[in-house]
Amino acid sequence: MRSWVLLSLVLAGCAPTVAETRQADARQAKSDAKLARALQGLTPGPAQTCLSSIDRRNARIETYGSTTLYRVGRDRVFRNDMNGGCGTNTIDPIYVTQTPSTQLCRGDIAQLIDRASRFPIGSCAYGDFVPYTRAR
């Protein structure tokens, strides 16, 4: 009986507080609003499984929570919704990816490295790459 009480106290200490949940929700809403502004005026196309190395090398990379945008010029953006533990609204990690080919493809793993400590802090898998283009 005593161990059950102790276990319930330990588990209760691990649960997020109401304030922490509200802060996380506010950060997510802010990130979603920034993402919507970044894609404003762009039209999504059919999803692609891979992003060529040419597009990737010429891209400016922006992250919004678990979504990564590869901005190739003014009129073309590739959106990737990462799977796994890449939803970071509080830190700006370094993404390290080792690919078996010259393309970055769905299912490739990205390891997250903390900029300050240079220690690994997580990993996740890339999803489909959705091209967004500006209507002319």
Where do the protein language model's features map onto the residues?
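N-terminal secretory signal peptides
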Residues: P16-R79
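Sec-dependent signal peptide recognition
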Residues: M1-L7
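C-terminal motif of bacterial Sec signal peptides marking the signal peptidase cleavage site
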Residues: L11-G13
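A residue-level signal for beta-strand positions that form part of recognition/binding surfaces
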Residues: S8, V77, S123-Y126
